[in-house]
């Protein structure tokens, strides 16, 4: 009986040995010891082995050691800045050479007068035209002077009549005498060019001022407005300027300015409206020299 049991055990051991050799044992994977191994992964053969006959597992290979990190290269050393080179010593400024004594200026040589070149024909014609224009202007001025000397006396008497009426003086012309004066004055103003009417008005004003000066210097003489038919056709004036008055023909004196402005305003109000003529506006602000208005 015992032998039978021994034989049976040997047969079982032999069969288990053959199966153990044929079946590869799986290599155990390294696991964290803290985690439990699953129960279903152990082969059935190992569970049938008897104690004392368990096969030893091959030794586990050690984990590869991590390669050490390469040692860090040391940082490059900063190169020091180059030291500035010292400036070279400045050279002294060159001394200016001493001034040489000034040479005397050359004496200017006397220049002989150059002979005048003959005037060209074109320049001669231009000079001749200028002379002709000047002669024409002088002739026009002479004609205007004659008109002012002989023909503006009626305008003087008309303005003087208005001046006497304004100041309530006794020397007032009658209506039969005043109307012909108006007609003669307007006829003469119409003949005077527009650019010369301002001068004509100023001459009328100056004639009135001279007339009043003569009356003040000769109170006993008979200086009065006479009949137009006796004086105007011959172009004679009503008064003779006193030879003792050097200012009879000249510019307006400072003491005469108020009187001049008063009579001028009266003339500018009377003559343009009476004769229907245009008088430039600047006549009320300018003062023209007189002396053109002559009396005989």
UniProtKB/Swiss-Prot annotation:
Does GTP-binding count among this protein's keywords? no
Residues annotated as signal peptide: 1-20
Q: What does the UniProt keyword field contain?
A: Allergen, Repeat, Seed storage protein, Signal, Storage protein
Q: How is it modified after translation?
A: Substrate of transglutaminase.
Pfam assignment, any one: Tryp_alpha_amyl
What are the boundaries of the region Disordered? Answer: 24-126, 220-255
Keyword match Repeat: yes
UniProt feature, compositional bias: Low complexity: 37-58, 117-126, 220-241
Pro residues bias (residue ranges): 25-36, 59-71, 81-116
Q: Where is the composition biased (Polar residues)?
A: 242-255
Q: Which GO terms describe its molecular function?
A: nutrient reservoir activity
Q: Show the PANTHER family listed in the entry.
A: ALPHA_BETA-GLIADIN MM1 (PTHR33454:SF7), PROLAMIN PPROL 14P (PTHR33454)
Question: Which family does the entry's similarity section mention?
Answer: Belongs to the gliadin/glutenin family.
In UniProt terms, what function does this protein have? Gliadin is the major seed storage protein in wheat.
Q: What else is known?
A: The alpha/beta-gliadins can be divided into 5 homology classes. Sequence divergence between the classes is due to single base substitutions and to duplications or deletions within or near direct repeats. There are more than a 100 copies of the gene for alpha/beta-gliadin per haploid genome.
The molecule here is called Alpha/beta-gliadin clone PW1215
């Amino acid at each position: 009986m015992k032998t039978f049991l021994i034989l049976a055990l040997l047969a079982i051991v032999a069969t288990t040995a053959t199966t153990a050799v044929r079946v590869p044992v799986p290599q155990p994977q390294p696991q964290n010891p803290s985690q439990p191994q699953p129960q279903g992964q152990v082969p059935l053969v190992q569970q049938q082995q008897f104690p004392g006959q368990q096969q030893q597992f091959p030794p586990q290979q050690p984990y590869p050691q991590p390669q050490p990190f390469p040692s860090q290269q040391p940082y490059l050393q900063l190169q020091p800045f180059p030291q500035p080179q010292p400036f070279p010593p400045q050279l002294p400024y060159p001394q200016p050479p001493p001034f040489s004594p000034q040479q005397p200026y050359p004496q200017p040589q006397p220049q002989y007068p150059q002979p005048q070149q003959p005037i060209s024909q074109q320049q001669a014609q231009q000079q001749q035209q200028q002379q002709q224009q000047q002669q024409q202007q002088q002739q026009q001025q002479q004609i205007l002077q004659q008109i002012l000397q002989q023909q503006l006396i009626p305008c003087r008497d008309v303005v003087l009549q208005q001046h006497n009426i304004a100041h309530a003086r006794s020397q007032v012309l009658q209506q039969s005498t005043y109307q012909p004066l108006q007609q003669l004055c307007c006829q003469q103003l119409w003949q005077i060019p527009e650019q010369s009417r301002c001068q004509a008005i100023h001459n009328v004003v100056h004639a009135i001022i001279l007339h009043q000066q003569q009356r003040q210097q000769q109170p006993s003489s008979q200086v009065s407005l006479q009949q137009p038919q006796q004086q105007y056709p011959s172009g004679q004036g009503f008064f003779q300027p006193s030879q003792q008055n050097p200012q009879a023909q000249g510019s307006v004196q400072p003491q005469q300015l108020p009187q001049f402005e008063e009579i001028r305003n009266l003339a500018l109000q009377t003559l343009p409206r009476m004769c229907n003529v245009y008088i430039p506006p600047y006549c009320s602000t300018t003062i023209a020299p007189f002396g053109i208005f002559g009396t005989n």
